[in-house]
Amino acid sequence: MENGGRPSLCQFILLGTTSVVTAALYSVYRQKAWVSQELKGAKKVHLGEDLKSILSEAPGKCVPYAVIEGAVRSVKETLNSQFVENCKGVIQRLTLQEHKMVWNRTTHLWNDCSKIIHQRTNTVPFDLVPHEDGVDVAVRVLKPLDSVDLGLEAVYEKFHPSIQSFTDVIGHYISGERPKGIQETEEMLKVGATLTGVGELVLDNNSVRLQPPKQGMQYYLSSQDFDSLLQRQESSVRLWKVLALVFGFATCATLFFILRKQYLQRQERLRLKQMQEEFQEHEAQLLSRAKPEDRESLKSACVVCLSSFKSCVFLECGHVCSCTECYRALPEPKKCPICRQAITRVIPLYNS
């Protein structure tokens, strides 16, 4: 605390930082909780012969937020893996990721760093169909890349290490960056894979479509089943809730600490003011009872023992209130009896 009981700059920064972080974490928690609640309330629709009749009876021939599960089937053509034979899919993602070590000037350590230097995603139209044979129904999946959880499977991974000469190594140490290599990855959504779709289910011209939902709800095309997907979302909600509570507790603790310090400072000021008033009252009583010739000596008396003359000037407060013996008897750390400020230096006072 600074003088006067005001919070210090560090305390203001700490309180402001924890408050902002708490507000941000709480906002993320509320958003995650809302997403989880909407996902929990999504209507489960069976991919069967009665799907079109269910949608035709729904308001607007639409289920705003539905869960449907089926197998992936391409509409016409398929995508072939560039690295794996006889691997066909409807979504293909090729990624080149650079891995390197970067020198941290603060910690004086080499830190791992990775960066995507190239990524390409190819898609072809595909449907979700029942796992059972003989059921003539399909759901066309629209805008799959808008999904927040695209169930791609890594079918190929290879790391290409960097080949470095001695001069390259010296140059990397000087520049503070040491390349490790390039990781090449291919991910695919295979034909026949089981996919759980969560989105808007619409019947349009006798065809069923699954598309991104409206009203800010999230679109899912996950390789997990619905229960696992919901459990993962709820785990995420619990994590953000715990983080918000921890930082909220830190904010409350910081605020309590600041207010408590202010309260104690105020109580100390009131106590010192009361002591000063008592000293002045006691001194006034002594002066009123003393003989006229003794009043000057009483004005110069030590406020502690009232028997010796004041002989010390306390710095930095500048009070002249104590004799040398009483100053030496003050407990460590020595503080002025009047204002309770720390005594940094004592100047002897000589009475003529």
Curated annotation (Swiss-Prot):
Ranges facing Mitochondrial intermembrane side: 30-238
GO CC annotations, alphabetized: mitochondrial outer membrane; mitochondrion; peroxisome
ZnF locations on chain (RING-type): 302-340
Ranges facing Cytoplasmic side: 1-8, 260-352
UniProt entry keywords in alphabetical sequence: Isopeptide bond, Membrane, Metal-binding, Mitochondrion, Mitochondrion outer membrane, Peroxisome, Transferase, Transmembrane, Transmembrane helix, Ubl conjugation, Ubl conjugation pathway, Zinc, Zinc-finger
GO MF, any single term: p53 binding
PTM section of the record: Ubiquitinated by PRKN during mitophagy, leading to its degradation and enhancement of mitophagy. Deubiquitinated by USP30.
Keyword Protease: no
EC number: 2.3.2.27
Bilayer-crossing regions: 9-29, 239-259
Crosslink feature (Glycyl lysine isopeptide (Lys-Gly) (interchain with G-Cter in ubiquitin)) location: K52, K273, K299
Superkingdom, natural source: Eukaryota
Catalyzed reactions per annotation: S-ubiquitinyl-[E2 ubiquitin-conjugating enzyme]-L-cysteine + [acceptor protein]-L-lysine = [E2 ubiquitin-conjugating enzyme]-L-cysteine + N(6)-ubiquitinyl-[acceptor protein]-L-lysine
Record Gene3D superfamilies: Zinc/RING finger domain, C3HC4 (zinc finger) (3.30.40.10)
Quaternary structure and partners: Homooligomer. Interacts with MAP3K7/TAK1. Interacts with UBC9. Interacts with and sumoylates DNM1L. Interacts with MAVS. Interacts with TP53 (via N-terminus); the interaction leads to ubiquitination and proteasomal degradation of TP53.
Protein purpose: Exhibits weak E3 ubiquitin-protein ligase activity. E3 ubiquitin ligases accept ubiquitin from an E2 ubiquitin-conjugating enzyme in the form of a thioester and then directly transfer the ubiquitin to targeted substrates. Can ubiquitinate AKT1 preferentially at 'Lys-284' involving 'Lys-48'-linked polyubiquitination and seems to be involved in regulation of Akt signaling by targeting phosphorylated Akt to proteasomal degradation.
Name the record gives this protein: Mitochondrial ubiquitin ligase activator of NFKB 1
Organism: Macaca fascicularis
Underlying gene: MUL1
